[in-house]
Amino acid sequence: MNAPLHREMPGGTLDAATALDHATRQWDSDIVKQLTDYIQIPAKSPGFDKDWATNGYIETVLRNAAQWVEAQKVEGLKLEIVRLPGRTPVLFFDIPATKAESAQTVLMYGHLDKQP
């Protein structure tokens, strides 16, 4: 792994109390409902649903996730759905750094398909 660990955050970058308040409000007002709706959709990974493409559940959760990301109205957000034959689609989005001199990258990875 090339990422530096335990690096100090520059002062003034983020007010922890403001961030916590925002995250708590979002969690209570939006995210819990989004997660509740998501877990009701049986979007199983191909290893557990050979008819995943025909069933369309992964397509549904992908569309819902893309709509949620776009609804956040993040400045500079670029969203793309990457499709390869025979593979589950990938939701890829990129947000440029807020400071031009920033050379750091943050990678977040998750799955929209599930396992029973």
Q: Where are these predicted regions, by residue range?
A:
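Acidic/His- and Gly-rich active-site-bordering loop/insert found
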Residues: N2-P116
